[in-house]
Amino acid sequence: MEYTSIINFLEKIGKIANFNEKELDLLKRPQFIHQAELEVSGKKYSAFRVQHNNSRGPVKGGIRFHPEVSLDEVKALAFWMSLKTATADIPLGGGKGGITVNPKELSKEEIEELSRDYVRAFYKVIGPQQDIPAPDVYTTPEIMNWMCDEYEKLIGEKAPGVITGKPIEAGGSLVRDIATALGGVYVLEEAIKRIVLTEKTVAVQGFGNAGMNAAKLLAERGLKIVAVSDSKGGILNNEGLNIEELVKVKSETGSVVNYTNGEKISNADLLELDVVVLVPSALENVITVENASEIKAKIVLELANGPTTSEADKILYSKQILVLPDILANAGGVTVSYFEWLQNNEDNYWDAETVKTKLKKKMVSAFEQIWEKYSENDYDFRTNTYLLAVKKILDAEKLRGRV
């Protein structure tokens, strides 16, 4: 993801909503950019923490360990986190962090040392009321716990709210493991209430955490999952797939393609199936100008980040396909991270039903706010989502007298 795409996006939104140059310039520039060079086992690694906007509260965003992490990417992701927290209507801003490293090349001890070094480099600019990191690509609850432990050592007191995505035993929140999928399911349920459907068939591209849990949750609610896929390919059964069996096959063999009660298909084929709901939950840019005209779903639920290109969006809208955009559809994850932060700060612990009830309330409210705007104008659902999120951030900036 390039930061130039953010600039282009803001120019487009600015023209639609008549935001002035000062307002747009404020959003184009992250408030703070922090960089460091870390060294583990004689090798040096670039580390970043970007705080895009704190007008609505402390910034929130994950830390990723990946060989392609760059400052440009982290800046772009921090911006999207500002939009996502505003969309979910939680009182937090957007941030992001990362280390340019291939964690598969490091031992567990080296990963722990690198994680603690990251906190030592940035502990003065993070904190429960300043910047709250979380897991992201190739970072885990265990890594978050190491980071939290290091932060507490450095400041000399307990501060579990400094980081979310921790293990349950260390102050993590129940439901966090399914939060992204569950939040998306709540949004989809609201959309289905407003669209006349003769059947409820679903295809899920991606069978990692979000895709697998979405398939399970939707099947439990009576929707028919007819196709799923992972990086090795997909499986189709128009009579409906047994999701529990698929989970077992994936766990035991490494791929859903080894499931025997169905027809093997490609990831590209899955996207073009004649289903009611399409759930891209794996990669960016899978729905493009090349295949958008072949999409037959009535609803696209974006559990992945950025699965639809802007050119494809126009085609889908012209076909009256409702796209539930990523910053809404997968905001369940950051919302339950917010709940974890609240529980830590209050020295409290919510049971699973409490978390689910609060998550549903947040996701339904966010959807309803956007749907109201969507029903009043000629812009697609994604554009309305972005407009509302940017307006919330700028309204907060105005109240602070910064714009």
Question: Language-model segments: which ranges?
Answer:
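Glycine-rich phosphate/diphosphate-binding loop of Rossmann-like nucleotide-binding domains
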Residues: T164-P167, G172-D274
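Glycine/serine-rich phosphate-binding loop and adjoining beta1-alpha1 elements at the start
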Residues: T85-T198
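Conserved active-site and cofactor/substrate-binding residues in soluble primary-metabolism enzymes
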Residues: S5-N8, V69-D72, L106-D117, Y138-E142, ...
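Glycine-rich, N-terminal phosphate-binding loop and its surrounding beta-alpha-beta segment
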Residues: P30-P103
